[in-house]
Amino acid sequence: HSDGTFTSELSRLRESARLQRLLQGLV
């Protein structure tokens, strides 16, 4: 099955969450 797309999706989610946390820390 598509394992690569899943990992890429997961990494993107993690990155977006980290960005949100960074933005919250800036505010």
From Swiss-Prot:
Subcellular localization(s) per the UniProt record: Secreted
Modified residues (Valine amide): V27
A Pfam family: Hormone_2
SMART domains, alphabetized: GLUCA
Primary localization class, coarse: secreted
Designated name of the protein: Secretin
Top-rank taxon: Eukaryota
Keyword Secreted (UniProt): yes
GO biological process, one term: positive regulation of lipid catabolic process
Transmembrane segments: none
